[in-house]
């Protein structure tokens, strides 16, 4: 499977849970910015992997992977011995 764009909205405001339990990455490795996109208030990024955060539960946490972000995340999935299929099943 090959993806060039992935965007998933999680109905939670707990960014740490999404990064560490769903993506299985470490939040301290991400850079935090006090501004966001798409009317989100802040975001975290690791390379081209973006996690946008809103205090509003309706918006929740948004994961956005564009082309290079998908390739980077594939590298992490490979290191975790997971596939895209397994990742989407965990989501």
Residue map of PLM features:
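Structured, helix-rich domain cores that form ligand/interaction pockets
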Residues: 1-91
């Amino acid at each position: 499977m090959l993806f060039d764009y992935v965007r998933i909205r999680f109905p939670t405001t707990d960014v740490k849970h999404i990064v560490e339990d769903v993506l299985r990455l470490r939040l301290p490795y991400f850079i935090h910015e006090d501004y966001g996109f798409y009317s989100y208030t802040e975001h975290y990024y690791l390379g081209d992997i973006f996690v946008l955060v809103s205090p509003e539960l309706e918006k929740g946490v948004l994961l956005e992977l564009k082309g290079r972000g998908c390739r980077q995340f594939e590298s992490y999935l490979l290191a975790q011995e997971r596939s895209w299929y397994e990742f989407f099943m965990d989501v």
